[in-house]
Amino acid sequence: ITATNNLPESYNSEPQRATVGAAWAMLGKAYMAAPEETGLRDFAKADECFKTIINMGRYELLNDYADLYRYDNPNTKESLFELQFNNVYPDCNYWEFDCGSRACDSWFGQGCSFSGYDFLVPTPFAYKTVEEGGIWEDGDLRKEEALRYDFTYYTNKYSEDGTFEYVTPDLSKTQWTGTTDELEPHIKKYEDYRTDILSGLGINNMWNSGKNFSMIRYADVLLLHAECLNELGQTSEAVQIVNNQIRTRAWGGNLPEDKKWNSGMSKDEFRDKVMDERLRELCFEGWRRIDLLRTNKFVELIKERNRWAKESGTIQDFHKRYPIPDTEIKTNDAFGPEDQNPGYSK
């Protein structure tokens, strides 16, 4: 609240600084995510925060979803707050290293802009189509911008005469990992072509990825506004916001009739559908865990949709909280082993 009363709308040439728009967004998110037992969860107050942002007239959706992830297009009119990076150490962010394919690294080296080490990979639910049991609908343009499905690369590494050719990798060079998902769809949003040897910029190293990381986008604000309207009994208006703005852009400006949400849907139906829409719009941007926690779907949907959680069977209710770090317990006089969150070793 203090930030909303004191921060400016802009710092002009200092985009790394949080503005009042970002403060209103975070306050609205706090009202929505507050545990119900605290009495602080308040959709009306949250919606006032989001309407304040909308009425500022400062932010709008980009026409093309793909433009959000261009390395040469940071801090757009859709951005309320971005973490700033560049390709020069120590200001690079290693996202490519985390999200890229180890198979591509083994085949093409670290100068391929989608090489990496598979530390962050999407679940099958997040990359499959609805027909395959996943999230993506036919014609949704966000799918190909969010995820890499094709790992074919233009290289001279495997030609006898040094000519460039298109090479599609397989798993033959990564059998030592004992896994088989190195060429399953990967996160594409943070690939930075500047690091690619083919860019001609001389970086040639996936470690130096430097795209900004978007923390709060106007699309997020609109979806939260719609969610609040639904909770406040204005489901039809909420549907129109999602149809006319979020989904229309996702289909390139012309939303087919069969992709329009029914304005007569129930409040419960909208709750479920808007969570899936948030996944399509904001996947890999850091909000999914909080969304699942605040809607009390964390354990249920991870068990249902997360391949690795299914296989391990480890996800439990106590995982809603992180453990208190052992170093904090040992060095902070205010904590003792008995203060560890339930479910974790004391």
Question: What name fits each language-model region?
Answer:
Residues 259-270:
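Short, mixed-charge amphipathic alpha-helical segments
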Residues 1-7, 15-54, 81, 140, ...:
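Extended, hydrophobic/aromatic-rich amphipathic alpha-helical segments that build helical scaffolds
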Residues 4-9, 57-60, 250-252:
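Helix-capping and short linker residues that terminate individual alpha-solenoid repeat units
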Residues 11-23, 68, 262-264:
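A glycine-rich, coil/turn loop motif that links secondary-structure elements
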Residues 1-11, 197-204:
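Short amphipathic alpha-helical segments and their helix-coil junctions
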Residues 52-55, 59-222, 229-231, 298-346:
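Elongated scaffold/linker segments in the mid-to-C-terminal portions of large proteins
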Residues 255-259, 287-294:
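A glycine-biased, small/acidic residue-tolerant capping/turn segment at secondary-structure junctions
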Residues 36, 40-43, 91-95, 156-158, ...:
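Short, solvent-exposed loop/turn and secondary-structure capping segments
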